[in-house]
Amino acid sequence: MFDIRKYPQALAVSQSAALTPEDYRRLYRQSVEDPDTFWAEQAKRLDWIKPWSSVQQCDLHTGKARWFDGAQLNVSYNCIDRHLAQRGEQTALLWEGDDPKDSKAITYRELHRQVCRLANAMKARGVKKGDRVSIYMPMIPEAAFAMLACTRIGAIHSVVFGGFSPDALRDRILDADCRTVITADEGVRGGKRIPLKQNVDKALASCPAVSSVLVVRRTGGDVAWTEGRDLWYHEATKDAGDDCPPEPMEAEDPLFILYTSGSTGKPKGVLHTTGGYLLQATMTFKVVFDYRDGEVFWCTADVGWVTGHSYIVYGPLANGAISLMFEGVPNYPDTSRFWQVVDKHQVNIFYTAPTALRALMREGSAPLQSTSRKSLRLLGSVGEPINPEAWEWYFEEVGQKRCPIVDTWWQTETGGIMLTPLPGTQSLKPGCATQPMFGVQPVLLDEKGKLIEGPGAGVLAIKASWPGQIRSVYGDHQRMVDTYFKPLPGYYFTGDGARRDADGDYWITGRIDDVINVSGHRIGTAEVESALVLHDSVAEAAVVGYPHDLKGQGVYAFVTTMNGVTPDDTLKAELLALVSKEIGSFAKPELIQWAPALPKTRSGKIMRRILRKIACNELENLGDTSTLADPSVVQGLIDKRLNQ
């Protein structure tokens, strides 16, 4: 097992933090022992039109979750209108374009005007409460306007990441039965143009029910036009009126659908509802990031992913925060871009993914040295377990040992952060998601579904409902029950493995299907990956299992080296020795394949499912590859595979 290093939080952090360790323990205890009282108190963070008749009616055996039944509220009112009196002239969205010369600040008053105009324009085009609207946009302010305008009139948005192919977009439009699409002529990313309108046109060739397409003019590029269906966004909103009354919504009315890839079959449309989701996003944003008035918060995600929904748009704006929206990529025009943006906008809280950090770590410290980053107070990690090496680089180099790191674990299906250290309440451990958020009751179960007490490793499950819980898979409720509630009756099944240490802290070890059983030893792939990337020559590693004649399963590692490193047998021997030292000789990879790049989704997650197929020589059906950022990577790995 790894040596666990602990980083006590600096006295300055503890003294200024909103919560003490005692506060956390007291509030957590109340949240699990008396959840109705706790959540009724937390719900005061929102403005309600009508109070609830019951706080919750939930049953994890069936997946039923109803929170704040009978209550009414409006999401856009909570994110905009209620702030106008006190902070109408404060910045709400700070936009940084792909080109460093492009940026703009949008106040809460301007946000209100833009959202109302678009909401009125949508109503004029026949969009009404309950209708589904597909949003296929670049990272520009209009993407947030579109989401909020839907919530204002009670339409259900389905945001599709702008990197998805026309086929993937088509499938999502058809699955949600969207009649309206909001898009842009083109997107801009890393200096390149992305043909969004062209992709929409291709998708809509198979979607005859779509009657309305609003198009934002982002680049002014030439686009094809279908009269009667297509309308320029600026023309639709020009005379639409600056006020649109917010539609009162039931707490359990659907708010949005967000598609997440299933390991098999078509993507799942995860459905979230209005009251519970907004409370989860609002509370976790405030508590986890210890947000203080006037601070600049930057989540580097795209609004096409749940992280962008919860921590670019809804969580920050419901709290009256300043939220930075970034159109670009970490390495354009060069690899100091993130840190240049931090200095330019005096960012206080920075929330990004381990994949981005590992890529930047690979470039060394020179890109950091051209910037000050003195404005930073808190750092966050999201999307996958962060390996200790990347954590330490983030803490020591990016945050200059001043900024605590909140290593957050959650999922599209949970709506908001579930496990995380809180600023000032405990020591930090590199790579450890530590403690549950209020109201979250994690448990570990063995293969037979038996509870594991004390330190141990097993399947991570949640034993009581929380407000941000998934309510359904759109159009296929049984699929939700089968996926999340059938595998472990009475629990929400996360699909992730975890271990609990002697302090009771949780370490995410990777997906359950990322556990390899070698000669009876259960090995978490994340642990082997963390050992491999401890080597100075290794930039990234992905580990999967494959059938082994003697051991049942063997360990197959795909390893990407640092720039300038030529992989050879000496490096291979050093890596095997490192895994032996860090975990044990039983965890040593049988096969190490040098990989110039790994297959990743456009959100930066490694597609381990494809790597497993390559390692197992199962090449006839690689499954859905539409989410890959660079599909050509896969063929290169197949050609050089070691298990032929």
From Swiss-Prot:
Gene3D superfamilies: 3.30.300.30, N-terminal domain of ligase-like
Keywords, alphabetical: Acetylation, ATP-binding, Ligase, Magnesium, Metal-binding, Nucleotide-binding
GO molecular function, one term: acetate-CoA ligase activity
Binding sites annotated in the UniProt record for CoA: R189, G190, G191, K192, T307, N331, S519
Binding site for Mg(2+): V533, H535, V538
GO cellular component labels: cytosol
Residues annotated with N6-acetyllysine modification: K605
Keyword set includes DNA-binding: no
Catalytic activity, reaction form: acetate + ATP + CoA = acetyl-CoA + AMP + diphosphate
EC number of the protein: 6.2.1.1
InterPro entries: Ac_CoA_lig, ACAS_N, AMP-bd_C, AMP-bd_C_sf, AMP-binding_CS, AMP-dep_synth/lig_dom, ANL_N_sf
Names of required cofactors: Mg(2+)
Pfam families given in the database record: ACAS_N, AMP-binding, AMP-binding_C
Domain of life: Bacteria
CDD domains assigned to the protein according to its UniProt record, in alphabetical order: ACS
GO BP annotations, alphabetical order: acetyl-CoA biosynthetic process from acetate
Binding site for ATP: G383, E384, P385, D407, T408, W409, W410, Q411, T412, D496, R511, R522
Post-translational modification: Acetylated. Deacetylation by the SIR2-homolog deacetylase activates the enzyme.
HAMAP family documented for this protein: Ac_CoA_synth
Family: Belongs to the ATP-dependent AMP-binding enzyme family.
Role according to the record: Catalyzes the conversion of acetate into acetyl-CoA (AcCoA), an essential intermediate at the junction of anabolic and catabolic pathways. AcsA undergoes a two-step reaction. In the first half reaction, AcsA combines acetate with ATP to form acetyl-adenylate (AcAMP) intermediate. In the second half reaction, it can then transfer the acetyl group from AcAMP to the sulfhydryl group of CoA, forming the product AcCoA.
NCBIfam families assigned to the protein according to its UniProt record, in alphabetical order: Ac_CoA_lig_AcsA (TIGR02188), PRK00174.1 (NF001208)
Protein known as: Acetyl-coenzyme A synthetase 2
Organism this protein belongs to: Pseudomonas putida (strain ATCC 47054 / DSM 6125 / CFBP 8728 / NCIMB 11950 / KT2440)
Gene, per the UniProt record: acsA2
